[in-house]
């Protein structure tokens, strides 16, 4: 059962309810089949997504909805869009815009029930996506370090663009940024 997803250019996030033993085989099959499809369609070869998959057991509902928020906000954090509903390769559109009517949806109806029990409306769940959350959702130390560096770089890139800074050396001399 798929609870949330977001497909980026070099990786994807997928929240699934699965038997742990079947998860590895499922992910191997998914990556392999998608690589064949993508490579045939675009005349490419090799892996489509970088690295192996990482999984984490979600035991608390509060952590689950925070992970969904993290997944949906991935393209916003990458500055691809300013709103989660503007990104076409995410379950956010299926959940919030009811795109299920237009095409066969892949989100489990179970997650919609869980969300309706936790939030009074989809608007409230949408607003929850805009609540700041600095949780990294990463369990592997090397990935946490890489994530921290990416967050710093992302912040600096945003700061440079926002303040129209042409020379990156200027930013390094700003005391409140260092």
Regions found by a protein language model. Give the residues of each.
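Conserved active-site beta-strand element of glycosyltransferases/polysaccharide synthases
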Residues: 15
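Short Pro-Cys-Gly-centered "Cys-loop" motif that presents a nucleophilic cysteine in a tight turn
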Residues: 1-4, 8-9, 18-178
